[in-house]
Amino acid sequence: MIGICAQFTCQSGKNAEFEALLSEFVTKVKATEPGAVVYQLCKNEKNGDEYFMLELYANAEALAAHGKTDHMTALVGQIGAYLAAPPKLTQGPAVN
């Protein structure tokens, strides 16, 4: 298994649109990617403009397939309009 934590900082005042965009994306991932074992958007309770996506993939093939989906391509083209900074990604193998 491969885990990823993607951190996002949303532009102030664009939270509702950002959450709607990511919620639709998460729904598509869960519906079409069986190798995405966990895919969940979370919000920082101490800073309402910070979000993180918890991602867990069954294997490297599932992660590679995720990056090639139509919904990922669409998200990459749209998400920048809502971000205050580039996303930060942390990736690594599951320990247990």
How would you name each of these model-derived features?
Residues I2-T32, V37:
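N-terminal first-folded block
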Residues G13, G48, D70, A74:
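Short alpha-helical
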Residues C10-S12, N59, P93-N96:
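Non-catalytic surface loops within mature trypsin-like serine protease
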Residues Q40-K43, Q91-V95:
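A general secondary-structure junction signal
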Residues I2-T9, V38-G67:
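Short, well-ordered beta-strand segments in beta-rich or mixed alpha/beta enzyme
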Residues M1-I2, N96:
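Absolute protein N-terminus
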Residues E24-V38, L56-T90:
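An amphipathic, aromatic/His-enriched active-site/gating alpha helix that lines ligand/cofactor pockets
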